[in-house]
Amino acid sequence: MELKLSNEKGEAAGQLEVSDQAFDAPFRESLVHQVVTAHLAGARAGTKAQKTRSEVAGGGKKPWRQKGTGNARAGTIRSPLWRGGGQTFAAKPRDFSQKVNRKMYRGALRSILSELARQDRLVVVKQLTVDAPKTRELKARLEGLGVREGLIVVDEIDANLELAARNLPRLGVVDAAGVDPASLVGAERVVITESAIRRVEEWLS
């Protein structure tokens, strides 16, 4: 299939022939959902920890005798019913990661990129550079491409480009090797350079 190719000013620069396997695949919603969910789950720290009644310090002595005080019976001041006591079902560190094999991961990327292309949300440019780390300069380039927010995918991240994009809200910059399903799904539009799309195509074909 062919994708529209633009220059940095947003002017048409011809057509780019790309692999049907990578950019004209059917959209598989269930697969995309599974892979994106797994990706986000893997980003969870899972370090939450609380103490049960047996782990909280103190509470070894019975607060008062069993009968005769008029108070409810109590065996420890670290009961979950008490302020400062342990948690009834205390949270412990856990691993939230889910297994996704390479075939599924690549299939999800193909589905997402193909759907972005079908919806005209994939903007292919010959190259995207800025002469200095100036947000104003990058913003002007993106507006010329009709992009206000989304994701920029380049072959290799340039320091000027990264610094210029850092001050723009809802705009991310990744290299071709760092493209992930969650970032693509969450992007309003994806700006990708010709060299980056060739690397992605090579990996997915």
From Swiss-Prot:
Q: Which UniProt keywords apply?
A: Ribonucleoprotein, Ribosomal protein, RNA-binding, rRNA-binding
Ribosomal protein found in the keyword field: yes
Q: InterPro entries attached here? A: Ribosomal_uL4 (IPR002136), Ribosomal_uL4-like (IPR013005), Ribosomal_uL4_dom_sf (IPR023574)
GO cellular component terms given for this protein: ribonucleoprotein complex; ribosome
Q: Where is this region: Disordered?
A: 43-78
Give the SUPFAM superfamilies listed for this entry: Ribosomal protein L4
Task: List the GO biological process terms.
Answer: translation
Q: How does it assemble?
A: Part of the 50S ribosomal subunit.
Q: What does this protein do?
A: One of the primary rRNA binding proteins, this protein initially binds near the 5'-end of the 23S rRNA. It is important during the early stages of 50S assembly. It makes multiple contacts with different domains of the 23S rRNA in the assembled 50S subunit and ribosome. Forms part of the polypeptide exit tunnel.
Q: Which HAMAP family would you find in this protein's record?
A: Ribosomal_uL4_B
Q: What protein family is recorded?
A: Belongs to the universal ribosomal protein uL4 family.
The protein's name is Large ribosomal subunit protein uL4
**The organism's lineage?**
Bacteria, Pseudomonadati, Pseudomonadota, Gammaproteobacteria, Chromatiales
Gene name of this polypeptide: rplD
